[in-house]
A protein has these predicted regions:
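C-terminal motif of bacterial Sec signal peptides marking the signal peptidase cleavage site
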Residues: 15-18
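A short, amphipathic beta-strand motif
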Residues: 35-43, 176-183
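Extracellular beta-sheet/turn segments enriched in Thr/Pro/Gly and aliphatic residues
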Residues: 120-171, 307-375
Length: 375
């Protein structure tokens, strides 16, 4: 498993997004009384306590926007901190917007900011050259009232406090986490064995909105961890771009645990399921490699396809908004699998036999969805 995980998260579509390391300005002079605003955010996650949990709750960069109507009045960008202090503003009712890890730069119009989309870029959790870094997080626009003097948000109670609690950020993508996998071949397949070689995902959306009740874009592409021309099943979305970072080599299922899990990020997906696949080779009870359909391809590879958050026989869930086939922002889909039968030669055509796979999923905020599967 990779210690540093890449994931598909997107480039920003605005051409004017120059990013300076320190940006702080009164963009629109107003006639109201001069004031300052300091803000603290909370990007915490219940899952960050896990030993192998990725640093996808870290704030690499933080941008704070204050709008008077639709016009930008105050802006500040800070790095590697959850606090932005002494932003120059004026008194009155304002709209506060906070974005982490997106590096947007100054956006002079609130309407324009709310229409920004993320598109088509592979990004690292850790820095690499000029790549965008970290999971993008946002807070929907907040209406606040600025008073004369110092104003604070998230620094506790006291004079000038707009809110004592930090502003809550939510992650724009979802996370798909394989937290456990084992075999228990039974019936006619008792004594069979499975030797895993890799885990990958496909049908992963490559674009997303930043704001709004639904982040999915009508026009977007999809990514896959691998593809072979022989895969022709109904689950496959055409024209997917293969991204090696959506695949991990695995030689031992017991190495996958809740504290050492395999994970991928995906934007919101409505309608077409995102699929996680465990791929490897089957041997029968005499130790012979199984080749050929329906259980394996001509090279002896079988595939166990898991439709993330879908409703299927053998799938069990804990959490909210489960079994819909959709992926939602700021949600961790934690998948456990028990393999009981052979898989299929084509991962885009999952087996009809419900006894093939037991899947269990948990969903919480990060919302977590636990998905337990018997395959």
């Amino acid at each position: 498993m990779k210690a540093i995980k890449l994931f598909a998260i997107a480039a920003l579509t605005l051409g004017m997004m120059a990013c300076n390391k320190k940006e702080d300005s009164n963009v629109i002079p107003n006639e109201g009384t001069q004031a300052t605003l300091s803000i603290k955010v909370d990007a915490g996650s219940q899952l960050r306590a896990l030993g192998a949990s990725p640093a996808d709750g870290d704030v690499k960069s933080l941008e704070v926007y204050v709008y008077a109507g639709d016009l930008l009045e105050g802006y500040k960008k800070v790095e590697n901190t959850s606090e932005a202090v002494d932003i120059n503003v004026t008194t009155g009712e304002r709209k506060l917007v906070v974005v982490a890890n997106a590096n947007l730069g100054k956006i002079n119009s609130l309407t324009e900011l709310q229409e920004i989309a993320l598109r088509d870029k592979v990004v690292m959790v850790e820095p690499s050259g000029d790549d965008q870094v970290g999971v993008v997080m946002t807070a929907e626009p907040q209406t606040i009232t600025i008073k004369a003097g110092k104003n604070t948000y998230g620094f506790g109670a006291g004079e000038g406090s707009i809110s004592s609690a930090p502003l809550q950020l939510v992650k724009v993508p979802a996370r798909i986490s394989l937290v456990g996998a084992s075999t228990s071949f039974e019936g006619a397949f008792a004594g069979w064995t499975f030797e895993p070689s890799e885990v990958f995902v496909f049908n992963v959306p490559n674009s997303s909105r930043l704001f709004g009740p639904s982040l999915e874009l009508v026009e977007m592409g999809r990514y896959a961890g691998m593809k072979q021309d022989s895969w022709t099943g109904d689950l496959w979305v055409p024209s997917q771009v293969v991204k090696e970072v959506l695949r991990d080599e695995v030689s031992d299922l017991s190495s996958i645990t809740p504290n050492n899990f395999i994970y991928y990020h995906s934007f919101e997906s409505i309608g077409k399921p995102v699929v996680l696949v465990i791929r490897g080779k089957l041997k029968d009870d005499s130790g012979q490699l199984v080749k050929g359909a329906p259980f394996a391809d001509d090279n002896g590879y079988t595939h166990y396809s898991i439709l993330v958050n879908a409703e299927r026989s053998g799938y069990a869930y804990t959490g909210d908004d489960t079994g819909t086939g959709n992926l939602k922002r700021n949600t961790d889909y934690r998948i456990s699998v028990v393999i009981k039968r052979p898989g299929t030669s084509d991962p885009t055509t999952p087996p009809a036999d419900a006894a093939t796979l037991d899947v269990k999923v948990a969903v919480t905020p990060w919302l977590t969805v636990n998905q337990n599967i018997e395959y």
